[in-house]
A protein has these predicted regions:
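Hydrophobic side chains in well-ordered alpha-helices
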Residues: 17-20, 87-91
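A cross-kingdom feature marking solvent-exposed beta-strand/loop segments within repeated
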Residues: 4-5, 24, 28-38, 57-75, ...
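Short, charged/polar surface micro-motifs in flexible loops or helix N-caps
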Residues: 48-51, 58-60, 84
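Vicinal oxygen chelate
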Residues: 3-12, 33, 42-47, 51-52, 64-90, ...
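Short, structured motif recognition centered on aromatic/hydrophobic residues
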Residues: 4, 8-11, 21, 44, ...
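An N-terminal domain-start capping segment
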Residues: 12-26
Length: 135
């Protein structure tokens, strides 16, 4: 059964955005730049899930374009699955509109793909799986 892995929030500045979470006693446990996505990420544990702050490294990146169009705020909700390949095939078979039909490798070596908001009630949905050697 999929579980919420993280909630992605697009921000102009991780340094500025993290201050509100730190004021609440929360702390960034991992920061990383994902070069192929042109984004810096910061993960903040929140119970069994995490908050992922997303800061673009270039204005023409997906997150940069999101900020230019919509401003800071909710970018995506990520669901963790045990078998990302099976999830991808199931969603393809159901006709879901996928951002990409390829599984990508993101922050922390996690595997992921995105489902377009037109298939999910208006929310960009990330499907992700922990790093393993045989995906």
């Amino acid at each position: 059964m999929p579980e919420i892995d993280h909630i992605g929030i697009a921000v102009k500045s991780i340094a500025q955005a993290r201050q509100i979470y730190e004021a609440l006693g929360m702390h960034v446990v991992h920061e990383e730049t994902v070069e192929h996505e042109h984004v810096r990420t910061a993960m903040i544990p929140a119970g069994d899930a995490r908050i992922e702050l997303l800061e673009p490294t270039t204005p023409d990146s997906p997150v940069g374009r999101f900020l230019a169009k919509r401003g800071e705020g909710l970018h995506h909700v990520a669901l963790h699955v045990d078998d990302i390949s099976a999830a991808l095939e199931t969603l393809k078979a159901q006709g879901a509109h996928l951002i990409s039909e390829d599984i990508q490798i993101g922050a922390g070596g996690h595997f992921y793909f995105f489902v377009h908001p037109s298939s999910t009630g208006g929310v960009l949905l990330e499907i992700c799986q922990d790093p393993v050697s045989d995906v």
